[in-house]
């Protein structure tokens, strides 16, 4: 018969000690110097040994201003240096796989619809292409073709079942008629990750901060919007169609230097032909943007008020605009293409984008 060895007392003691709660550590909160000393000691106990003290890392991460340095000259796919850089705020959403096409490009701005059940475990998230299908559902083939060329073709290739998207917003027609759809749809930042599944997908966006990949090592993600739904307001004011950067003309009144940063906006308008999403970029201030948008939409506004008679007080709202974030006005934006199943959609790409979503503001 084999005799079992004696019990390892050291291992038994270590296991029992692991069941006991850790000893409490007192922090002096009456004096600032002693509080700093106690916190420094607490951090050093739980931090790994390195060439830089734990207190220095803690102080640099919380007190030093964040600075972002991009390697690669502003081109997509560059890596970020970690000197004083603060990580972005990511948002995770669980959505139905049938409502989101896995071919959607990373960097696509996403919008969450939330109306009745704030505690639902499954979210309703739309892309610019799926919103295009939702807004043109039920208008007929002629109306959809009139709304856009390549955008119509690509949207119908990606989302060939408009009824699936319409089920996510069952009272879409009433919300548009009452001019209240923008109250329930919220920009949630550009797409940076999509974990595919059979029934449910988990997608991740950058709600606030630099738009980078969630996986480490971090890499920049280019924001991508359809070119047919994009307007450069600075170029529109000057009568041209060029990219960002340089100087701006103000209605022919002369030259003005552009600020270092430009902003990307999204506008939801309730036009006579139906609701429409449009992206704008400009380096001008907030008040100027609102006035410029009223001038830009003035033909549609006057047409609607002249055709629709009589107007109900709840039908006076023409649209709303929200800011999606900022980017370098010097680098500006560039044209590219999104390819899918032999079709190509002209898109606009923006590098080094900083997601900073604002609330909707009524244009008129």
From Swiss-Prot:
The source's domain of life comes to Viruses
Q: What keywords sit in the KW lines?
A: Capsid protein, Host nucleus, Virion
* Subcellular localization(s) per the UniProt record: Virion; Host nucleus
Q: Name one GO molecular function term.
A: DNA binding
Gene Ontology CC annotations of this record: host cell nucleus; viral capsid
Similarity remark:
Belongs to the herpesviridae TRX1 protein family.
Quaternary structure annotation from Swiss-Prot or TrEMBL: Interacts with TRX2, MCP and capsid vertex component 2/CVC2.
Q: What does this protein do?
A: Structural component of the T=16 icosahedral capsid. The capsid is composed of pentamers and hexamers of major capsid protein/MCP, which are linked together by heterotrimers called triplexes. These triplexes are formed by a single molecule of triplex protein 1/TRX1 and two copies of triplex protein 2/TRX2. Additionally, TRX1 is required for efficient transport of TRX2 to the nucleus, which is the site of capsid assembly.
Q: What is this protein called?
A: Triplex capsid protein 1
Origin organism of this chain?
Answer: Epstein-Barr virus (strain B95-8)
Its taxonomic path starts at: Viruses, Duplodnaviria, Heunggongvirae, Peploviricota, Herviviricetes
GN (gene name)? TRX1
């Amino acid at each position: 018969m084999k005799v079992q060895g004696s019990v390892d007392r050291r291992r038994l003691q270590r296991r029992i000690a692991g069941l006991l709660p850790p000893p409490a550590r007192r922090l002096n909160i009456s004096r600032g110097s002693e509080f700093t000393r106690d916190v420094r000691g607490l951090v050093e106990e739980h931090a790994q040994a390195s060439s830089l003290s734990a207190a220095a890392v803690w102080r640099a991460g919380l007190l030093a201003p964040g600075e972002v340095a991009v390697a690669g000259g502003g081109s997509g796919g560059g890596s970020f240096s970690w000197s004083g850089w603060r990580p972005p705020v990511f948002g995770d959403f669980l959505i139905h796989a049938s409502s989101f096409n896995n071919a959607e490009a990373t960097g696509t701005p996403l919008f969450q619809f939330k109306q009745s059940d704030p505690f639902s475990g499954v979210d309703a998230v739309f892309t610019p292409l799926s919103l295009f299908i939702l807004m043109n559902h039920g208008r007929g083939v002629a109306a959809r073709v009139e709304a856009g060329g390549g955008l119509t073709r690509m949207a119908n290739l990606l989302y060939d079942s408009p009824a699936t998207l319409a089920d996510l917003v069952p009272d879409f027609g009433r919300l548009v008629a009452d001019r209240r759809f923008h109250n329930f749809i919220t920009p949630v930042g550009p797409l940076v990750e999509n974990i595919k599944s059979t029934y449910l997908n988990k997608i991740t966006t950058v709600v606030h901060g630099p738009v980078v990949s969630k996986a480490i090592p971090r890499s920049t993600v280019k924001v991508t919007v359809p070119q047919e739904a994009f307007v450069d307001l600075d170029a529109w004011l000057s009568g041209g169609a060029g990219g960002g950067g340089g100087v701006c003309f103000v209605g022919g009144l002369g030259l003005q230097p552009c600020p270092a940063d430009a902003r990307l906006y999204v506008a939801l308008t309730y036009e006579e032909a139906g609701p429409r999403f449009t992206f704008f970029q400009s380096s001008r201030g907030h008040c100027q943007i609102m006035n410029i948008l009223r001038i830009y939409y003035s033909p549609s506004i006057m047409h609607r008020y002249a055709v629709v008679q009589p107007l109900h007080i709840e039908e006076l709202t023409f649209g709303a605009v929200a800011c999606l974030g900022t980017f370098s006005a010097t680098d500006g934006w560039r044209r590219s293409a999104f390819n899918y199943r032999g079709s190509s959609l002209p898109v606009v790409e923006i590098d080094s984008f900083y997601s900073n979503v604002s609330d909707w503001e009524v244009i008129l």
